Structure formats: structure tokens, C-alpha cells
UniProtKB/Swiss-Prot annotation:
Disulfide bonds listed in the record: none
Entries under InterPro entries matching the protein: Ubiquitin-like_dom, Ubiquitin-like_domsf, Ubiquitin_dom, Ubiquitin_ubiquitin-like
SMART domains, sorted: UBQ (SM00213)
Pfam families the record matches: ubiquitin (PF00240)
Lineage top rank: taxon: Eukaryota
GO cellular component: cytoplasm; nucleus
Biological process per Gene Ontology, one example term: protein ubiquitination
Organism: Dictyostelium discoideum (Social amoeba)
Protein name per Swiss-Prot or TrEMBL: Ubiquitin-like protein NEDD8-like protein 2
GO MF assignments: protein tag activity; ubiquitin protein ligase binding
Similarity remark: Belongs to the ubiquitin family.
Amino acid sequence: MNINLQFHSTGKRTELNFDETDKIELIKNSIRIMEGINPQEQKLIFDGKVLKDTSTLKSCGIKDGSTISVLFEKSSNFLK
């Protein structure tokens, strides 16, 4: 199924293909490859809820054509 990722920091929107049984951590790893942002620094939000890494797309209610908001959180390493 096709999932839309909306990057709030840049306004960029990307469509990727995943299976309903894929976990949120797979999406975060895909974002790491595309954007170079570590999964620990990513926050994915759907339907007003922060998505847990171990949840599947299906268990989060994500369907074909859904949009997931992507936020980046700076880790404490950036403050040093």
C-alpha cells in the first residue's frame, strides 16, 4: 500500500510503498536512508497519535493513501 509522508520541517511530501504488516520502525529506517535522520530523532504521527516503533501499520489504522506526519527532534548530542 502507498503511504504519504509529510515532513513538517521542510514541507516535503513523499509517497512510499509498505505492507500493512510492516512496523513503524521500518518506516523510520526508510526515512533515515532518505533524509539521514536517526530513527531515535524521528516522531511519526497519525490521527493525532505518536506511533510506536513496534506497532504495525494495520494496528495503527493506517490504510492505502494515508498520510503520516514526520517530525524531527534534535537529540541531546546537538546541544553539546
